[in-house]
Curated annotation (Swiss-Prot):
GO terms for biological process: protein unfolding; proteolysis involved in protein catabolic process. The lineage of its organism: Bacteria, Pseudomonadati, Pseudomonadota, Gammaproteobacteria, Cellvibrionales. The gene is hslU. Belongs to the ClpX chaperone family. HslU subfamily. Pfam families: AAA, AAA_2. It comes from the Bacteria. This is ATP-dependent protease ATPase subunit HslU.
Length: 438
């Protein structure tokens, strides 16, 4: 679990997302409260439940990006899903309980990676011995014990220095289970995975001789040895506990399952999904192939644009289970300008690096960047507001000719206001054209 303070979390999010301080603060506090809760005694800890969040804001302002960046910071089981993927229980499609099953799978994967990192050094030593045995069968003393001869030591030194990387050896490796693809109706993924596990376990313990280069063999054998050193039962127990106590679920597009005013008829993927989400968010027990999972302390962060529906269109019970509401602001020309320059690996930096691989150097001037920002804002205003994603469209159109001719000759291009006007001026003046091209 992350031990970062709210200020540190916001600072980290600032490296990638411009503005939206309210949303950043809300998720930072929610994340820190997970750590604070774990410092309490067990009796009080069970009483404190997470305060779930609803993020509201137009498309392209950073809701999903906050989730993506948060996933990298948390060091806790994290899963991002779209509400539109699920249907009411009893209908064809995935039911919402599969969210928790996926969270547990994600937790097990995360824990396995952590445990394998811990035993990596021992696994590498064991893999080294197996490779040396293949290169140079060990000499045995009179008592039958393996002796580390001077020749073996020379080979060990060469192996560590990478001098034997390209040499081919024949080794025994675990046989890869035959992939059994089972087609099952939507919503029965749990049964499918159990059947696949049953078939794959039939091959457990079998080995086969394979020819590999020393470099590839070392990686494969290290992974194999690390897997042997990890206690699977203990790992699963830790993973289930981590998912229950520190798990975070981010549900995007929650507005798409809100029932719109004046819209009657059977809303299979709407109100039913909301009702199914209620017990999950409130706290219930979900059956998975790894055991029973309690959702009482899982943090749910939901987000939606709500440009057709309103947060009040969600059923009242669901609104009550999302007590913290954060509104994200629409982007201004100043925000667009900052998005183009401030974040780590900004859009301008990405395009410069891509074209530099072919010897084309492009330089963005301050007035050029301002002009791009103003055009993106103007097109959003006059057509459809898609937020920061508009910058991708504008930049691609702006650099189309340069990108097409890159590599034909080494040249330097300065992107200033005049250049931007020359490339995009006509498009922005003609609303019909910008509607289709930008």
């Amino acid at each position: 679990m992350s031990t970062m303070t709210p200020r540190e979390i916001v600072h980290e999010l600032d490296q990638h997302i411009v503005g939206q301080q309210d949303a950043k603060k809300a998720v930072a506090i929610a994340l820190r409260n997970r750590w604070r809760r774990m410092q309490l005694d067990a009796k009080l800890r069970t009483e404190i439940t997470p305060k779930n969040i609803l993020m509201i804001g137009p498309t392209g302002v950073g809701k999903t990006e906050i989730a993506r960046r948060l996933a990298k910071l948390t060091n806790a089981p994290f899963i991002k899903v779209e509400a539109t993927k699920f249907t009411e229980v009893g209908y064809v499609g995935r039911d919402v309980e599969s969210i928790i099953r996926d969270l547990v799978d994600s937790s097990i994967k995360m824990m396995r990676e952590q445990e394998m990192t811990k035993v990596r050094h021992r696994a590498e030593e064991a893999a080294e011995e197996r490779i040396l045995n293949a290169l140079l069968p060990p000499a045995r003393g009179e008592d039958g014990a393996v002796e580390d001869s001077s020749t073996r030591q020379i080979f060990r030194k060469k192996l560590r220095e990478g001098q034997l990387d390209d040499k081919e050896i024949e080794i025994d490796v675990s046989a890869t289970p035959v992939g059994v693809e089972i087609m099952a109706p939507p919503g029965m993924e749990d049964m499918t995975s159990q059947l696949q596990n049953m078939f794959s376990s039939m091959n457990t313990g079998k080995t086969k001789k394979t020819k590999l280069t020393v470099k590839k063999a070392f990686k494969k054998l290290t992974d194999e040895e690390a897997a042997k050193l990890v206690n699977e039962e203990e790992l699963k127990a830790q993973a289930i506990d981590a998912a229950e106590q520190n798990g975070i679920v981010f549900i995007d597009e929650i507005d798409k399952v809100a029932k719109r005013e004046g819209n009657s008829g059977a809303d299979v993927s709407r109100e039913g999904v909301q009702r199914d989400l209620l017990p999950l968010i409130e706290g219930c027990t979900v059956s998975t192939k790894h055991g029973m999972i309690k959702t009482d302390h899982i943090l749910f962060i939901t987000s939606g644009a709500f440009h057709v529906s309103k947060p009040s269109d969600l059923i009242p019970e669901l609104q009550g289970r999302l007590p913290i509401r954060v509104e994200l602001q629409a982007l201004t020309p100043d925000d667009f300008e900052r998005i183009l320059t401030e974040p780590t690996a900004s859009l301008t930096e990405q395009h410069q690096s891509l074209l530099a691989t072919e010897g084309t150097q492009i330089e963005f001037t301050a007035d050029g960047i301002r002009k791009i920002a103003e055009i993106a804002y103007q097109v959003n205003k006059s057509t459809e507001n898609i937020g920061a994603r508009r910058l991708h469209t504008v930049l691609e159109k702006l650099l189309e000719e340069i990108s097409f001719a890159a590599g034909e000759s080494d040249n330097n291009v300065t992107i200033d206001a005049a250049f931007v006007d020359g490339q995009l001026g006509e498009l922005t003046k003609n609303e019909d054209l910008s509607r289709f091209i930008l």
